[in-house]
Amino acid sequence: MTRIGFMSDLHLDSNQFGEAERMQLLQVLQEEQIDHLHLAGDISNNFKQMSLPFIQELQTQLPVSFNLGNHDMLYLSEEEIHQYDFQVQTFGDSHLVSLAGWYDYSFVPEKSKEVHLRTKNTFWFDRRLERPLDDPTITQEVLSQLDQVLASLDGRIIVALHFVPHKDFLVSHPYFQKFNAFLGSQAFHDLFVKHGVRDVIFGHLHHRHSSRVIDGIHYHMRPLGYIREWQLTEDFFKSFPQYKISQMYRLHKRYNAVKGLPEFHQYKRQHLANEFRQALTILDC
């Protein structure tokens, strides 16, 4: 039996991952008896110069696989993106299919494609990517290939992807609802139902959810996310209320107010292992 650990959204550069963080992560993986680690996208903003060296360092300690997220695609050609898509690994009678996924705006159907493009090109990270096709077309091509891959497999199927495959995980806050268009597509869930997929691990949206079953599919969403969003950052202000700011809902501002404090660095060292555990999904295959 192989014990697989899944994580997503490490964002190495934004979270200033160094040797201490890497060693702490390895310690957690060892304590949890992880035999194989899979990273489900958004490892960093520079795949070749940061993500790959990080993965190669981890691979000296245990097998590591990955799929891309949108942040990983920066500076990659479309050919390189395709190279890392649709990897299939077999563990006993279980198959792990990994892919990036994409989005088609269908989570916000009331707005036109033109409106979505204006929003994307004004606010969204993916405006920096140079993909040759439009988003709905990319998604249709990904779905078509995924359909073929899933149809070829027998036994237990596990899918790891980056983007959101079901509307139940969308953002409900009115300001952020327009960005749901760039999170994924319900069409992925429909394919998972069609092919009897057992487990799906994903990230992209930096909210951690308890595992839940929808139409027989076990969904797991526990992204690490940005340090300003971490539980330990939230808890720091409970332990040190004297550092609270007036606009605590402004995650950037509250983190910037404490990131240089010795107390925060010590608190992070004490609680980082637990943060990693909260962002780890474990499946036995």
Which residues are covered by each model-predicted region?
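Beta-strand-turn-beta hairpins that frame and shape the catalytic cleft
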Residues: 1-5, 88-98, 103, 108, ...
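N-terminal active-site segment of His-dependent metallophosphoesterases
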Residues: 1-60, 73-75, 124-130
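Active-site neighborhood of phospho(di)ester-bond hydrolases with catalytic His/Asp-centered motifs
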Residues: 6-8, 37-42, 64-70, 83-84, ...
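Metal-dependent catalytic neighborhoods of phosphoester/phosphodiester hydrolases
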Residues: 15-19, 40-59, 70-86, 91, ...
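Short amphipathic alpha-helices and their capping/turn segments at secondary-structure boundaries
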Residues: 29, 79-93, 97, 142-155
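Conserved beta-sheet core of the metallophosphoesterase superfamily
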Residues: 56-58, 65, 92-95, 166-251
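Active-site-proximal loop/helix segment associated with metal-binding centers of metalloenzymes
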Residues: 98-154, 163-175, 247, 253, ...
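A short C-terminal boundary segment appended to hydrolase-like catalytic domains
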Residues: 244-285
